[in-house]
Amino acid sequence: MKIIHIANFYGPKSGGIKTTLHNLGSGYTNRGHDFTYIVPGVGFYQEKTPHGNRITVPSWLIPFSGGYRIIRSNRQIKSILLALSPDRIEISDRFTLSGVGRWARSHKIPTLVFSHETLRGLIKTYQPFSLSKFVRWHNARLAASFDHVVTTTNFAAAEFREIGIDNLMQIPLGVDLATFSPKNRDEELRTKLLKNGDVLRVHCGRLSPEKKPERSIEALRE
């Protein structure tokens, strides 16, 4: 099967989106599928990667975002899709790429969209007020544009369940049990990091507003 995944906000400094794409690609290719992912960049080029074929297309740099980019032309994306004739299309973006879902439906190509976050949470990060009606309208429109909406947590799924959509799929994230295992506990490293303290707390995450890294400190204070 030929699968194409299109994503915004993919780049050298991105975390979750890049990890998702690379793991999806590795999983698909290991099972014999042809996987291509289309991502934003500074120009147009194509390359082979361990995770599949990567096509980079021209994009806009989002000001004050720390380097995030969004794909510039949906028309170019549709031309690429016509040339590659995918069996399935996946999208990781809830804003500028929903039109690709409607286009794919007109070409009888099955689709899904990943909702990696909550729109309500994104708005609260950058705006001091609630836009509940907009959130409900946007999520209903997004769900209607694709055959399936995929979330990984109850938290991300909640705002879709609130509006009663019938094409929601919740697929929990997997865990790399070889890497994240008690067998890897290192008492020497723990002692070194504690520096004669009583509690060692490790925060693994990007220092960006939407990740709310301050919560680790707040939880410890409580």
Residue positions per predicted region:
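N-terminal subdomain of nucleotide-sugar transferases
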Residues: M1-T56, R221
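Conserved donor-binding/catalytic core segment of Leloir-type glycosyltransferases
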Residues: I4, L194-R221
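Carbohydrate-associated surface elements
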Residues: G41, F155, G174
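A short, charged, and often flexible helix/loop element on the N-terminal side
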Residues: G52-S79, Q127, L131
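An aromatic- and histidine-rich active-site surface loop
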Residues: R88-R120
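Membrane-proximal helix-turn-helix segments that form the acceptor-binding/catalytic region
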Residues: S106, S132-H148, I163
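Short beta-strand->alpha-helix junction loop in the catalytic core
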Residues: P172-S181
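A short helix/loop element that forms part of the nucleotide-sugar donor recognition site in Leloir-type
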Residues: S181-K195
